Amino acid sequence: MARRFRGESNHKVDSKGRVSIPASFRRVLEAGDPNWQSGGNPELVIVYGDHRRKFLECYTMEAIDEVDAKIDALPRGSMERKMLQRMFHGQSFPTSVDETGRLVLPAKLRTKIALEDEAFFIAAGDTFQIWNPATYDQEELAAAEEWLDELPEDFDPMQYLDGAGGS
């Protein structure tokens, strides 16, 4: 199994859209790029297509290859395949980490998520997300708190994993 992204952090965004990626995230990007060599710059794909999402979803090369294989398995001509190709192929931005561990986010991507001078990075297993910190606080933290408030005080999150399969 591939390494997973873990953790969260805030990073400054400069006027050119450059933002440092958490060091632990860079290690996962390196491990998930079959063409990466020591001293090189790992590649990744940023998907921004779903207009309802207020974040950028960042995939390692291995993770996006898995998505591509699933899309390729859909029937040719199906609406699902067409829309997923548009979202994951057309509305995505292939890029690489620069020599100093930064991403350069184009204005189009920054505008989509209303990103200005600070970015919030949060791990999502085989991907990571980039958010405007205020948007994340308003939407995701509120949803998590609401969900937890509906559960009993002695709730154990591991109970959801019992019988989930895997190894």
Curated annotation (Swiss-Prot):
| Pfam families attached to this UniProt entry | MraZ (PF02381)
CDD domains per the record?
MraZ_C (cd16321), MraZ_N (cd16320)
Q: Where is the SpoVT-AbrB domain?
A: 8-51, 92-135
Task: List the record's Gene Ontology CC terms alphabetically.
Answer: cytoplasm; nucleoid
Which subcellular locations apply to this protein? Cytoplasm, Nucleoid
**One biological process GO term for this chain?**
negative regulation of DNA-templated transcription initiation
Q: Which GO terms describe its molecular function?
A: DNA-binding transcription factor activity; transcription cis-regulatory region binding
Gene3D superfamilies attached here? Transcriptional regulator MraZ domain
Under SUPFAM superfamilies, the record lists: AbrB/MazE/MraZ-like
Which keywords belong to this entry?
Cytoplasm, DNA-binding, Repeat, Transcription, Transcription regulation
Its quaternary organisation is: Forms oligomers.
The family annotation for this protein states: Belongs to the MraZ family.
HAMAP family attached here? MraZ
Q: What is this protein called?
A: Transcriptional regulator MraZ
What is the taxonomic lineage of the source species? Answer: Bacteria, Pseudomonadati, Pseudomonadota, Alphaproteobacteria, Rhodobacterales
Q: Which gene encodes it?
A: mraZ
